[in-house]
Amino acid sequence: MIRKNLLAFIALMVSITSLSAYSSPDKIIPEPVEHSVSDGFYNLKGDGSDVKVYLSDAKFAAKVAGLPAFAQEEAYELIVGKKGVKIYAMTEEGAFRARQSLEMMRLIDRDIQYCTIFDYPRFQHRGIMLDESRSFKGKEFVKKQIDALALLRMNVMHLHLTDAAGWRLQIDAYPNLTDHVAWRVGETYHEWEGLGYPFTNAEDPDAYGGFYTKDDIREIVAYAAERHIDIIPEIEMPGHSMEVNRAYPEIACVGPDGRPRPFSWDLCVGNDGTFEFLETVLEEVIELFPYKYIHIGG
């Protein structure tokens, strides 16, 4: 009896293993709009030679004609069959989204169940925000997050580059922003707050922080563009701007004693120097980020 039960258990385990020994569309996150499977699986090659892409196919164009324009641009149909993989899309961006769905299945297993996937985005803006002011991570971390966004078929990364806790972007016209307020004492915001908001410099052994050079940003933007992801920079204003007042107290508002208040959290809208500062900063930011939007906080 024990032997029979053991054999039955082994048979069950073999059955379960065989069922899960290949990947399928239900493993894709987020779930595609439509997907179906059929018997059989295809062993995906590693060089991409078995993936054929067809752009602006008339039949596919008719299929997506009723979708919003942004959805048409990113829509795709992915077909896995005995002869390989076919991708139909209107644009290179749509084909890229299809490849990411294929990659997500491949990460589970190279054996992909025969399937047909039709997918398009339901939302035009799909992304995350990285708070680089309070928690600076650096270029390689940002690129890793871009890869994760691409795999999830997202299309926006919001970089929160400035806040009271540190300025994170090279601005040639205002070097104090990176020389004096890109580094602080206290790794976490609460540690820094508890110490009285001290800033320091890169040579301090207790320094935490850093900033992105313009070349860093150009590299990040190019890396994101290859993955069809836009980078939205955030330059916080007029609040959450104590770091600016600490770096350039001459544009801070003055107190009743007639002296600047560098610990003020807000930019001084009554000081003409504030507007000169913002205009100059934004000119340099616009040169780095070739997109429609710049975020100013909220």
Feature names for model-found ranges:
Residues 2, 7, 12-13, 20-126:
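Acidic, contiguous N-terminal accessory segments
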Residues 71-277, 281-295:
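Feature activates predominantly on carbohydrate-active enzymes
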